[in-house]
Amino acid sequence: MKVRLVPLYFAEANDRERQEFADQMVRLKEFYGDVAEFLPEVCVGDPIPEADAILFPQLIFAAFRHNDELTGYKLPMVVLTSRFGTVEMWDWEIVTYLRDLGCTVFSPYNIDMAKVILRAIAIKRTLKG
């Protein structure tokens, strides 16, 4: 069973950031395709399809401007922003901010940890029935 991830992006992203987002999605599909199903990308604030978790392949400053939208999703969030398929070290500030808002945020620092987290989120769906 694969975890269903819905990647979120920010409308405020510039052209360079949009390309980096697309490049990161390619990498993440390579790293995690064996444990994750990647749903279509959704802009922060828009409705999301049925999913197990939210994926942030990129975090930008705009995250600080979307409190209501982000807290409204009620799904765990996984931050995989580095080119190595883990969390970028400077994203800790946004991760901490999201946690302070009450979001459940996972920011794995290696691929093995990320896969354990993703598998656990997928299993949760099975256990709920």
At which residue positions do the language-model features occur?
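An N-terminal assembly and electron-transfer interface module characteristic of large anaerobic redox
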Residues: 1-129
